[in-house]
């Protein structure tokens, strides 16, 4: 079976909002994420993807989840990290040209927006409660 591994960054600002992105081919929002490149650690992938998709520099605080699933016959492993914004400014610089919007979403917005990965909502809400 073919395998794919990626990383996702959960970044919460001082207003208790989560940084989310929307891609042109999705009806929903998701945390910044993407595939691990050759020679890259999951942590390095997370930092790179957040920068590319949102413009923000982040540092990894801790790994908080690993999601394993099968999508269209591909074994998918996604590493989730809690990250902290340390610099940069908002601006999408996605080399894949997939991300069309990045925004901070509040707790009330998280409960009402469409999610690209609805199964992640519980994890996001848990992170806001910490």
Regions found by a protein language model. Give the residues of each.
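A short coil-to-beta-strand element that immediately follows conserved catalytic motifs
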Residues: 56-65
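Short connector loops at helix/strand junctions that flank enzyme active sites
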Residues: 4, 31, 76-78
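Structural detector for helix-capping/boundary residues
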Residues: 34, 48, 61, 105-108
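Nudix hydrolase/Nudix homology domain
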Residues: 27-29, 96-130
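Conserved N-terminal beta-strand and adjoining loop/helix that marks the start
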Residues: 1-18, 66
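Conserved Nudix-box catalytic region and its N-terminal flanking loop in Nudix hydrolases
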Residues: 13-52, 56
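Active-site-adjacent beta-strand/loop module that shapes the phosphate/pyrophosphate-binding cleft
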Residues: 69-91, 103, 107, 124-128
């Amino acid at each position: 079976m073919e395998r794919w591994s990626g990383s996702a960054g959960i970044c919460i600002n001082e207003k208790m909002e989560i940084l989310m992105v929307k891609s042109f081919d999705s009806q929903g929002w998701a945390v910044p994420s993407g595939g691990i490149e050759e020679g890259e650690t999951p942590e390095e992938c997370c930092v790179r993807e957040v920068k590319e998709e949102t413009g923000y520099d982040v540092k990894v605080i801790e790994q908080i989840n690993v999601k394993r699933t099968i999508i269209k016959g591909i074994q998918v492993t996604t590493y989730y990290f809690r990250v902290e914004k340390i610099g940069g400014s908002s601006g999408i610089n996605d080399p894949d040209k997939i991300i069309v919007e990045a925004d901070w979403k509040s707790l009330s917005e998280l409960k009402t927006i469409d999610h690209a990965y609805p199964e992640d909502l519980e994890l996001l809400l848990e992170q806001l409660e910490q």
